[in-house]
Swiss-Prot record:
Region forming the signal peptide: none
The keyword Chaperone is annotated on this UniProt entry: no
The keyword Ribonucleoprotein is annotated on this UniProt entry: yes
Known partners and oligomeric status: Part of the 50S ribosomal subunit.
Protein name: Large ribosomal subunit protein uL4
Skewed-composition ranges (Basic and acidic residues): 233-248
Gene Ontology CC annotation, any one: ribosome
UniProt region (Disordered), positions on chain: 48-95, 210-248
Species for this entry: Tropheryma whipplei (strain TW08/27)
Purpose of the protein: One of the primary rRNA binding proteins, this protein initially binds near the 5'-end of the 23S rRNA. It is important during the early stages of 50S assembly. It makes multiple contacts with different domains of the 23S rRNA in the assembled 50S subunit and ribosome. Forms part of the polypeptide exit tunnel.
Record GO biological process: translation
Recorded family membership: Belongs to the universal ribosomal protein uL4 family.
Length: 248
């Protein structure tokens, strides 16, 4: 039986329980997969703009600093050599991208594993809404009465400005919209609080994870692939336009 979550109102009163979707909140966590996805996410945070100058890029003369023999020093042909003061850096960092390609199925499986860990520990909760007007005091009251941890992840819809303005200044509370929910934020938070609307969007109408860039627009769909009939019609149209131009 999949875990359940307590549903609260903005006053902190329990108004019911909700059976969580099994394959999202009661899966088999793969620790290696979660680690791989989190490392890829942290690597994507890096800008990769680091840069040092090589001996070909540093400023300096090409003149030989001293004669080849007779000084007792090791021979040297340039003041831009790595061992010289002000010389170039050998094998230094150069601008690069740290992005790891991570398939969507892996990202989805890792997120389900993280949510499963929190759900089995009773740390996934749902609130009806944050009210009609933003109120930091009401949000603090909700967190205190329900005993939510100071490390809290709030998941709301992108259009829910009331939730955003109610919790944005509370220390230790991070708010993300449904399209931003990820494994790293779930792991770094002790409790996860969904608004009811965000939970419905997250699981989708069929009880499946609506994993897309815009989960708040379920009507968005990909263009339909052309059929052989469409290709034939397009060929006929091009042929007709060609005949009109040539006067045939």
């Amino acid at each position: 039986m999949s875990p359940s979550a307590t549903v609260f109102d903005i006053g902190g009163n329990a108004v019911g329980t909700l059976q969580l979707v099994g394959h999202l909140f009661d899966s088999d966590p793969n620790l290696h997969l979660i680690h791989q996805v989190v490392v890829a996410q942290q690597a994507a945070f890096r800008q990769g703009t680091h840069k040092t100058k090589s001996r070909a890029e540093v400023s300096g003369s090409g003149r030989k600093p001293f004669r080849q023999k007779g000084t007792g020093n090791a021979r040297c042909g340039s003041t831009r050599a790595p061992q010289m003061r002000g010389g170039g850096v050998v094998h230094g960092p150069v601008p690069r991208s740290y992005v790891h390609r991570t398939p969507k199925k892996m990202i989805k499986a890792a997120l389900a594993g993280c949510l499963t860990n929190r759900a089995r520990a009773g740390r996934v909760h749902i609130v009806d809404s944050f009210g009609d007007t933003p109120s930091v005091a009401d949000a603090l009251t909700l967190f205190q009465i329900t005993g939510l941890s100071s490390k809290l992840l709030v998941v709301a819809q992108a259009s829910d400005s009331v939730a955003y303005r109610s919790v944005r200044n509370i220390p230790g509370v991070r708010l993300v919209h449904v399209g931003q929910l990820n494994s790293y934020d779930v792991l770094r938070s002790d409790d996860v609080l969904f608004t009811r609307g965000a939970y419905n969007v997250f699981v989708g109408p069929s009880g499946d994870l609506a994993f897309s860039e815009d989960r708040d627009n379920p009507g968005t769909s990909l263009p339909k692939s052309p059929t052989p009939e469409d290709s034939s019609d397009a060929t006929k149209a091009r042929s007709s336009r060609h005949d009109d131009r040539t006067g045939a």
